[in-house]
Regions:
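Flexible glycine/proline-enriched surface loops and loop-helix/loop-strand junctions
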Residues: 56-61, 71-73, 109-116, 176-177
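Active-site helix/loop module of the DD-peptidase/beta-lactamase fold
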Residues: 1-33, 54, 85-118, 122
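Structured C-terminal helix/loop/strand segments within mature extracytoplasmic catalytic/sensor domains
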Residues: 185-285
């Protein structure tokens, strides 16, 4: 592992061949290369390996821990250079097949090299298999898949870490409990191994956290502290099992309290003071609250929305969260129109983007699954809706779009205003907090730059922050433009189950895939 990376000498420019400090495989494994080309640089070019090899180095390789997923990418590139196979091809007969992992996908860079440090899609059960393999010292069904010595050396602490608090091994994080370690993927994807308790814990949370310092992992540490030593196997507990089954059923079926809304009339929403009734003849294009009429249920509301189309302004906000656009290099042009359809009890929210209508079947009190395709890339999503009102009595449709094979989600709140208008607030997870934190880290790195100082002195930094916040959580307006008979095309929607439009269990199952950062492979 201490051998310098000479196999890529041909990719170095003349200056770096002479003066660049040598980076070793050990440096890559322990995140101590010091190479400055990192995840943020991949959007600027297609040859990541050459950019990495010719970028500057801070300090001396091997001294300081600095997490950089491109270190793992270079490890993947080394496998390809030495074997002539991609990392995925190399692992298929040696790891995936013996463990029975058949449903996986690993993204590649523009040059065809497996990304290594991210972009691996695995089922939750298969994530657990990796932890169990390490728990068993690399052995699976009496076959030694990974050398035992490698399991031991890779799970030992080699460096004190910055983001984590317990140290770093070879592509693995140490955990709080002595002897425990963790496969840590960003946004709440983790495999935690407790050898002394013979236990593996897998999480698939989709939160805003990048590393080990997060609420979710602190909860796990709270229940499995250093001094916790479990007794023998617990006896069966039918009462607890019944409660668990009930909770699971509630999550799967999306049990919620009945929703009530103000009455909807043609033209828009109107909030009249109690006791007042306004004739619809005085303002024919306004939906009014009407005293004495019963509040409609969601079905009635969706029927009245059926066929309505709104043109949006601005039209630069994409249906895809920024996270997906950047990491998949699938940039969107922005939603131009939004419409609603309700046919045979099936409600859909439809978005016109890139000249194509995208229909999203939406459940109330439950999720519905469908495929969303943009630029020939398909994404499995689950959508649910909720009708409510804000503090001013304005009717609101809250939409929750979960990208099931990603760790992101898009949330959209649509406010129905008078005069046939809507206001839309767009949110995403990971959201403003994490993205703004990333912006802070970038500005810290360039804080000594003269131009940066001048920019900051003129208030430019505050302006940049405001622009970023408006980009992450934008607001758009919509105006009613077309009658009910103009319906969007249906070709872009695919129900997974035509009988129930693919009702979604709230708990990821073995048939649900997820994107997982798997540096340890």
């Amino acid at each position: 592992c201490a051998l310098p990376i000479y196999i890529f000498q041909k990719k170095l420019n003349t200056f770096n061949k002479i003066f660049r400090p040598k980076v070793t495989v050990e440096n890559l494994l322990t995140m101590t290369s010091g190479v400055t080309f990192n995840e943020s640089g991949i959007v600027s070019g297609n040859d990541w390996l050459t950019s990495y090899l010719n970028s500057s180095i801070t300090g001396t390789p091997g001294e300081n821990f600095q997490y950089n997923s491109l270190n793992t990418y270079v490890l993947s590139a080394i496998v390809t250079e030495r074997t002539g196979q991609s990392l995925t091809e190399y692992l298929e007969p040696r790891l995936f097949a013996p463990l029975g992992i058949t449903r996986y996908f690993w993204e590649t860079c523009p040059k065809g090299i497996t990304k290594g440090g991210w972009g691996l899609f695995l089922c939750t059960e298969d994530m657990a298999k990796l932890g169990q393999l390490y728990l068993q010292k690399g052995k699976w069904n009496d076959q030694q898949i990974i050398p035992e010595f490698w399991v031991e050396v890779s799970t030992a602490k080699h460096k004190e870490s910055i983001e984590g608090t317990f140290g770093y091994g070879y592509q693995l994080w140490m955990e709080a409990r002595p002897g425990s370690f963790e496969f840590n993927g960003m946004l709440g994807q983790n495999v935690i191994v407790y050898p002394d308790m013979n236990m593996v814990v897998v999480t698939n949370a989709g939160n805003n956290e990048l590393f080990q310092n997060c609420v979710m992992l602190n909860i796990i540490r709270k229940h499995f502290p250093r001094n916790f030593h479990p007794a023998d196997i617990l006896p069966e507990n039918p009462c607890s099992q019944t409660l668990l089954n009930r909770l699971t059923a509630e999550l799967e079926n999306g049990i919620h309290a009945p929703q009530t809304l103000p009455a909807l009339r043609k033209g828009g929403w109107k909030k009249n003071p109690p006791g007042l009734r306004r004739s619809t003849n005085t303002r024919p294009n306004t939906w009014n609250y009407v005293k004495g009429l019963p509040a409609p249920n969601p079905y009635q509301f969706t029927q009245q929305l059926n066929g309505k189309v709104f043109e949006l302004s601005p039209q630069s906000i994409g249906l895809f969260p920024l996270f997906i656009q950047i990491f998949h290099n699938n940039m969107t042009e922005g939603v131009q129109k939004i419409s609603f359809t309700c046919e045979k009890g099936n409600f859909s929210v439809n978005f016109l983007e890139s000249g194509e209508w995208h229909n999203i079947p939406t459940g109330f009190g439950k999720f519905k699954e469908s495929w969303l395709t943009l630029h020939e890339e398909s994404y499995l999503i689950a959508a649910s809706g909720e009708f409510t009102t804000d503090e001013n009595g304005t009717a609101v449709l809250k939409l929750d779009f979960t990208f099931l094979e990603e760790c992101v989600r898009r949330k959209i709140n649509i406010f129905f205003l008078p005069e046939d208008e809507i206001l839309i607030r767009w949110y995403e997870t990971p959201g403003k907090g994490m993205i703004m934190e990333g912006l802070e880290s970038i500005t810290e790195e360039i804080s000594n730059n003269f131009l940066y100082g001048a920019f900051k002195g003129t208030g430019g930094l505050e302006l940049l922050h405001r622009v970023m916040e408006q980009t992450i959580e934008p607001v758009s307006h919509g105006y009613l433009v077309t009658p009910a008979e103009v319906a969007p095309e249906q070709r872009s929607v695919s129900f997974l189950n035509e009988s129930d439009c693919g009702e979604l269990s709230a708990e990821p199952s073995e048939t649900t895939t997820t994107s997982y950062s798997a540096e340890s492979l």
